[in-house]
Design a protein with these regions (language model features):
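Acidic, surface-exposed loops and disordered segments
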Residues: 1-174
């Protein structure tokens, strides 16, 4: 049975990427809430084919930042969470688990930014992940630097979303 909740819909609509963070550690309670939201994410055939690697060590974060082309948020983040796909898992599920963690982060006042790791083999080496496991992205997390975020939005205001008429097709693409 589904429970209706306008708050969930609002959370999805209001979620924003945060690229600059305060120099402040995420509390244990907040981190556990974020990780637990990942744990509760649905998955194909309930496989739960993931492991979450939490990286706080600055040297590790710097090494991980070299594995992608657009990793600047890693440098000010308190931590990153790397969702690792186990061999029997699916990328679809990894996207679901990442989005749930980002929504949970926002719910406790923690900002997040999804970051693609373009050099998967390098990322696996940095994190000690076996070759048959997936390591394609991380989520940089921290408490938002509100002043920096306001300035970034002023320089590049949100453009909103395309109307549904441009995005939705019924029964066939064309």
């Amino acid at each position: 049975m589904l429970t209706t909740s306008p708050e969930v819909y609002a959370a999805v609509k209001d979620l924003r990427v945060v690229r600059k963070f305060q120099d402040r550690q995420i509390s244990t309670d907040h981190l556990e809430a974020i990780l637990d939201a990942g744990r509760w994410t649905g998955s194909s055939k309930n496989r739960q084919s993931w492991v979450f690697v939490v990286v706080r060590d600055r040297t590790q974060l710097d090494r991980l930042a070299q594995c992608g082309d657009f990793t600047r948020p890693v440098h000010s983040a308190d931590l990153v969470i790397a969702p690792i796909r186990l061999p029997d898992g699916y990328d679809w599920d990894m996207g679901r688990v990442s989005q749930n963690m980002m929504l949970a982060a926002a719910a406790v006042g923690v900002g997040s930014c999804p970051i693609t790791l373009h050099r998967h083999d390098d990322a696996r080496a940095v994190l000690g992940v076996p070759a048959d496991h997936g390591c394609q992205w991380v989520m940089a997390m921290g408490y938002p630097d509100d002043a920096a975020e306001r300035e970034a939005r002023r320089k590049n205001p949100l453009s909103g979303r395309k109307p549904l008429e441009e995005l939705v097709r019924y029964d066939r693409f064309a």
